[in-house]
Amino acid sequence: MDLLHKAKLAPLLPGVYIFYGKNKEYIYVGKAKRLRNRLLSYFNRSNGKYSKKIQAIVNEAEELDYIVVSNEREALLLEANLIFNHKPKYNVMLKDAEFYPYIEITKELFPAVQIVRIRSTGGEYFGPYTDVKFVKDLIDCLQQVYQFRTCRRDMSKSTKPCMEFYMHRCAAPCTGDLEPDSYINSSIQPLRRVLNGDISETLDLIEEKMKKHAKMMDFENAAKYRDLLVKFENVMQRQGVVLEQWRNLDVIGRFKNSYAVLRIRGGHVVGKLSYELDSTKLEDFIFHYYMVGKNELPEAVILERNINFDAEIYFGRPRDKLEEELLHKARENAKNQAYTSGLRKDLLNKMVKVLNLNRYPMKIEGFDVSHLHGKLTVASVVVFFDGLPRKNEYRHYRFNSDRIDDFLTLKELVKRRYSKHELPDMIFVDGGTGQINAVVEALMEIGKECDVVGLAKQNEIVCTRFGELILPFDSPILRTLVRIRDEAHRFANSFHRKLRRKSALSSILDEIPGIGPKRKKKLIEAFGSVKNIRSATLQEIAEVLGSRKLAAEILSRL
């Protein structure tokens, strides 16, 4: 039975519908007040809401099914559960949610603190945050005060402490000398209080340590805590203090199907988040943000109108002038998000026409190859989704050959990646016709097809399978391609530099008697580079090696 015929047989009742791709894979889940009407709209090209996304869903779908429910609320719940469990590729519910970092406290006997973008079911999460630099700086400050671990070591075995312990950044529960309750009370609980908005205890503690060292005439450590106090205050001020009273709020602004959330904890704005939803209903967004997204609920959620969710938490209009001002800010953020999202969609639509693409380039993957005279060859893959970088999907690839042949490296990269991964809508390569042909040939060898676009380094000439294009220097399409190329280049080079540092360190260590493979591995893991070893103390190196004599020999040679 074809899809259109099945749509015609659907009842005029509320329910959830599912489009399946190959191998019964979920590609889109939606809900409808009247299933038949909604499904038929997918096959009506004259429908004003017919879009590139709908066209892509219908073209890719191999099967259609639906589930009838009693009412719209039941449909909303079922839709949310199916999306959460199956993550269909064309569902953009709470699009951009994976871009935002969270702080995770792991559920372990000795919890670790991590910065993550994708949440599992095992941890305790704080966030999301918009500014990853803020998160890194915050963790850096707090680790110096509370000495929690950030590593992924197996805590079931006692081991020697790493460099973090000697730098007074970790209490080293890995040694087996700490009780779990002691570690949690001294390192994790104070961190939780800061992440919930209470920073006064931390400020007092840093100031107390600074004064204590100054009184003992230990001016070096007093200066260290003075600098830490200034840094911590600056980090928190970057987020902005907006309320004099202690209040934990989420303020949600809406413009069309764009939403903005201001997260306020303890009087600080700790997040300014932007999302898009297929629906323009405020209730749908709230449900997806808190129930499906599993984001923490504050004391109150400020909205443009009152909503009854049968919950103890207040969901409704501003209760004072300050909350009115915050709601206005959230609306302005949502409006700006809608505007920039519209610009991105226009740009991607123009790319289809100008570059002669077969598909709307919702997902673009960019390649770059880096090597040093054929040695240490690496490749990077960067991912752009809806015109924005999706950094949690970036990947590095290493190659063992010593050849200087970017074409063969590209071919190997394509085969390795797309033998296992799904193709994007467009592949971008740093190079011209030769690089494009290498990618196309590799795809053919594994029985796949995809639009491939390149950018020649000289004169920024755009290359496609149809030939070369010279776009104006200020063309948004050219600027987008340059941005993808530069990002792929940056990502490949950063990884290459890291490998070169490790290679240089490994070569130097090979020349020192008494440094075998095991000790060499320990030094590389602990310090990472020659520069870091040079700046380490004799005691720090000796602790890693278990030998002061060897540590002294290393320092003398460096």
UniProtKB/Swiss-Prot annotation:
PROSITE patterns: GIY_YIG, UVR, UVRC. It is found in: Cytoplasm. Residues 12-92 form the GIY-YIG domain. SUPFAM superfamilies: C-terminal UvrC-binding domain of UvrB (SSF46600), GIY-YIG endonuclease (SSF82771), RuvA domain 2-like (SSF47781). InterPro entries: GIY-YIG_endonuc, GIY-YIG_endonuc_sf, GIY-YIG_UvrC_Cho, RuvA_2-like, UVR_dom, UVR_dom_sf, UvrABC_protein_C, UvrC. Residues 200-235 form the UVR domain. Keywords: Cytoplasm, DNA damage, DNA excision, DNA repair, Excision nuclease, SOS response. One of its GO terms (molecular function) is excinuclease ABC activity. One of its GO terms (biological process) is SOS response. The keyword Membrane does not apply. GO terms for cellular component: cytoplasm; excinuclease repair complex. Interacts with UvrB in an incision complex. Belongs to the UvrC family. The UvrABC repair system catalyzes the recognition and processing of DNA lesions. UvrC both incises the 5' and 3' sides of the lesion. The N-terminal half is responsible for the 3' incision and the C-terminal half is responsible for the 5' incision. NCBIfam families: uvrC. This is UvrABC system protein C. The gene is uvrC.
